[in-house]
């Protein structure tokens, strides 16, 4: 995926000594080709380009790839990761790594079966503030941590029109369409990930139940009207969600 987020990942990889970027893939070939500029600027050789619905499958069959980095729309995270693991590749996935518990467990099983890493790229766990706070918690600065609160607020108003649209009939783009059709905390790990690390979740403790509660949707219908010029009678996701 080389739309909004993927190109930045390509650029960052060029700064890692010894890294070879051997292949680029996007549904739209033009987007993949545009990312060749980052390789050129770093004096790296051009990468092979794959595109279309199943381009990622051909990419994953290559025998010169160690890691597949996935930055597609959410619904393609799991199928691409599954394909990569089945082909013996390590996998790094932007959030969320899967769309339901069944997919989560399938990734765990595939990772263990094929002895390959499968990592969710929860960037909010690794900013300086979160890493510093985790270090303090691990060194007992806060004593025993018995309660924590995290949050993530992201105003997407400037970006709605830039999200990938599959064809001329797709007026909303994948992200607005998903929020229109689904309720809940669509990617809770930005706010929850750093808290989970401080609480040693899956390192001696675990969460058993999560409950997401949202407000009613006020701006959703207006977003559909603004971006697709059509009337929306049902926008499911609320304006604010608390888990």
Predicted regions and their residues:
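N-terminal Rossmann-like dinucleotide-binding module
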Residues: 1-42, 195
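Non-transmembrane alpha-helical segments in soluble domains
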Residues: 10-11, 36, 57-60, 81-85, ...
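Acidic-histidine catalytic/liganding microenvironments
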Residues: 13-16, 62, 127, 139
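Short, Asp-centered acidic motifs that coordinate Mg2+ and/or phosphate
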Residues: 23, 67, 147
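A short helix-to-beta-strand connector/capping loop
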Residues: 41-49, 113-117
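A structured beta-alpha segment of the ubiquitous adenosine-cofactor-binding alpha/beta core
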Residues: 46-70
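Beta-strand-loop-alpha-helix segment that lines the small-molecule cofactor/substrate pocket
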Residues: 67, 73-74, 78-126, 140
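Predominantly a Rossmann-like dinucleotide-binding segment in NAD(P)-dependent oxidoreductases
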Residues: 114-119, 124-242
């Amino acid at each position: 995926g080389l739309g909004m987020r993927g190109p930045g990942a390509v650029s960052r990889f060029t700064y890692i000594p010894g890294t070879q970027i051997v292949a680029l893939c996007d549904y739209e070939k033009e987007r993949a080709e545009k990312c060749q500029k980052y390789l050129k600027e770093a004096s790296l050789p051009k990468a092979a380009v794959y595109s279309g619905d199943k381009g990622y499958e051909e990419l994953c069959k290559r025998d010169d790839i160690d890691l597949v980095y996935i930055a597609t729309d959410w619904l393609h995270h799991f199928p691409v990761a599954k394909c990569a693991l089945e082909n013996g590749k390590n996998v790094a996935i932007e959030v969320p790594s899967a769309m339901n518990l069944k997919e989560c467990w399938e990734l765990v099983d595939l990772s263990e079966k094929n002895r390959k890493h499968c990592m969710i790229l929860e960037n909010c766990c690794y900013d300086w503030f979160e890493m510093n706070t985790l270090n303090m918690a691990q060194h007992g600065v806060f004593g025993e941590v018995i309660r924590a609160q995290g949050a993530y607020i992201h105003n997407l108003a400037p970006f709605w029109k830039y999200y990938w649209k599959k064809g001329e009939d797709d007026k909303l783009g994948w992200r607005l369409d998903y929020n229109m059709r689904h309720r809940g905390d669509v990617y809770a790990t930005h706010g929850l990930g750093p808290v989970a690390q401080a609480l040693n979740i899956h390192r001696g403790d675990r969460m058993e139940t999560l409950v997401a509660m949202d407000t009613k949707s006020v701006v959703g219908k207006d977003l559909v009207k603004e971006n697709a010029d059509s009337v929306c009678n049902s926008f499911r996701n609320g304006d604010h969600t608390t888990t």
